[in-house]
Structure formats: C-alpha cells, structure tokens
Amino acid sequence: MGTGAFYLLKERRFLPFFLTQFFGAFNDNAFKLAMLTLISYHLTHDQAQSEFYQAIAGALFIMPFFLLSATAGQLADKYDKALMTRLIKILELFLMIVGSFSLYWGNIFMMMLTLTGLGVHSTFFGPIKYAILPDHLPKKDLLGATGLIDGSTFIAILLGTTMGSLSIGMNNPRPYMAVFLTVIIAVAGLTSSLFIPRAPSTSEKIKIDMQIWRVTYKMLKQVTEHFGIFLSILILSWFWLLGTVILTKLPDYTNYVLGANNTVFALFLALFSVGIACGSVTVNFIFQGRISLPMVPWAMFAVSFFTMDLYWATPLMEEGSLLTLNTFFTQFTHWRIAFDLFMLAFSSGLFVVPLYTYLQVASPPQSRARIIATNNVYNALFMVIGTIMVISLLHFSAAIPKIFFILSLLNAVVALLAKINLKRVVLLEK
C-alpha cells in the first residue's frame, strides 16, 4: 500500500469499472456544455433566453435523482451490478445518438429530452458506483479505490466541461466535433463495461416497489435508524451544498469581483477539480487503507479556513479592462486566491472519501445500493437548498465575497457538530 492505490488500475477487478464511470461522467458534462454553448451562441438571441434554458437544463438533469433514485437502488440490490452497468451504458449510447442528431439539427426540445435521459442514466448508475466496490475489493482496498473513483469523477467533469464547450465552433453552427466526441465516448464506456467482473445480487428476493413516493419516503426514513450512516449522508450532502454555492458564484466572482476574463475562470475551475482529485487520492497515502472518521471534521475546518481566507484575500475591483491569465498573476493577492481555491477543494477531497468508504463498509450488503441511492437523494436536495441560499443572499444584496464569508462560518459550525457526533460513531463502531 506504500504506493497508494494506483496498482488497482492494473487489475480487472477495478480498471474496467473505473474507466466506465470516468467515461460516463465525462459524457454527461460534455453533452450538457456542448448543448448550452450551442444554445447560447447560435440558437438564442439574448441573455435572458439563454439563462432560461440554462435553468431548465439544470432542473431537468437533477429531477430524476428525486423521482427514480429509490427504484435505482432497488434494482442495483436485486440484480447483478455488472449487468446493470452494461444495460445503463447501452442506454447512454442510444441517448448520445439521439443527442448528436439534436445537436446537429439545433433542436432544443430534443436536446432537453436527451439531457433528461442522461439524468436518468446518472440516477441509475449512482447507486452502483459505490455499491459495487465492496463486491470486487477487500476492505483494505476500499479507501484507495473510492479515492480514485471520486478524484477521477471530478477530472472527468472538468475535461467533459472543457471539451464540450470547445467542441462548438463559434463560427460554425454545425457541431461536428461534439457529435463525434459524445458518441465515441459512449462507445468507449460501453466497451469497458463489458469487462467488469460479475457482481451477483445481494438481495434477490426483494420486490421492486414502483410506488415512487412511498419507497423514497421509506428509504429516507430507514437510513435515520443507523446513526453513523445517516450522519455520513448529512455531511456528504453538506459537501455538495458547499460545492454548489461556490461553483455557482465562481464565474461572477471571477468576472465582477476580480475583474478577470474567462481564461482565469477556466483556471479556477481546473484548480477546484484538480484540488478535489488530489485530496481524494492523498487520503489513502496518509491512512494506508484505514477509514479514519476523526480526521473528517479537521479537514472541514481546513475548508472553512481557506474559504475565509478567500474572503480576506479578495481585493476591491479597480476600473479597467478585464484581466487576462497573464496579467492576473502579476499580483501576489491573486496567487493567494488561486491557492485558497485549490486548498479548499483539496481539503474537501480529504473529508468526502472516508465518508463514502464508511458508507460502503457500514451498509448491510443486502441494502447497500439502496443506502447509496438514499444518499444521492439527500445530495440532490442539499444542492437545491444551496441554490436557494445563493438566490436568497443575493436578494438581500450580499456581495459574493460576503457569501463566501457566511459559508465559511456555517461550515465551521457544521464541522464542530460533525466532530462531536463522529466521536459517537467511532465509539458505536468499536
């Protein structure tokens, strides 16, 4: 274990699934950004129209997590997860073919329909993503494997977002590159899924309850019966709220507060994604496969520290042209801001990976996928709460740096509560 978990990338029990989830995360974001870029630059004629479609796209993608997560969890527990993954990848390939036609024709309705389908695809893959790891790996490998999965997801999001937006030509409304890219990646994902080893059913006798609201309520209630699992889900959901608030306001922070152009924003996005990935992988180097919950609140306190420093480091914007990537880093303060962004993301990676690993270990095998699915519902709910929080603070004329300040204080309170309550979990688990 001295070399971390990278040796797992040489093994069939991990590599095919690793590639499959990477390609899936890449494609979700590549298609979404290609679609939004096409709509913004070629299919709409004013900012309000473009922002309307952006809001609709966000709602359509997240909606299936509320409606179908319970069903997805049941299916993942009942059937072979490797087989389920292949079926999901076939669906993704079909969606990408339909989506490529919608991009080529510039049909917004078909694009939105495809994006909704990708939301369904992600909803059904979500429970499998973490529930399948204990089927293939011993407990000592789970922390490292989870770190690789978590870190690679954010790298895939970054690459997909970048490639998706760049695949739409500014002068050519026919998105040939986007069409080619999304279909090829879908084929790659399906191909890699064919090599995933079997992951037999852990709950064959379960009856699939198609009453969505009833089974969702039942699952949400059941996780509260296990204190450690419920607490982990709440902390993970708080992470997604943090990420939603920061990433939602990062473009405006870069433009209107720092007075920098889109190249600086692209760098910030890269720093954030790479920071989480580095933190996710570093956990296993530190703890050598041991799941350490006591370190979680300390990593959360670090997030608060760097978010607070982001507030203090933010200068008053001077009038003038937007700063480019070259001119932005002529000031030490801007280096400090970039460092803060990287480190708050790095610290986030340090605390989410042990929690995701704990969920895998603490969940009963026969209901593991349903518990992961329930976590996804809570994550989606907290992301919506984060969006509402930003809108509310802006309504009361809170400046973006002040939002970061408030966020750092709230996170410190959550970290303190986590520190107190995780002690109880550690005692209960001994």
PLM segments and residue spans:
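C-terminal ends and interior cores of transmembrane alpha-helices
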Residues: 86, 90-106, 301-330
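Substrate-agnostic recognition of the 12-TM MFS/MFS-like secondary transporter fold
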Residues: 15-33, 57-95, 110-169, 231, ...
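Extracellular/periplasmic helix-loop-helix junction of adjacent transmembrane segments
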Residues: 34-65
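Juxtamembrane intracellular "pre-TM" segments in multi-pass secondary transporters
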Residues: 1-15, 199-235, 256-257, 323-329
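Small-residue hotspots at the loop-to-helix junctions and early N-terminal turns
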Residues: 47-55, 262-269, 373
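Helix-loop junctions on the cytosolic side of multi-pass membrane transporters
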Residues: 131, 135, 182-208, 314-317, ...
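Transmembrane alpha-helix termini and helix-breaking/packing motifs in multi-pass membrane transporters
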Residues: 34-45, 100-105, 158-182, 256-257, ...
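Hydrophobic alpha-helical transmembrane segments
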Residues: 108-115, 119, 144-203, 275, ...
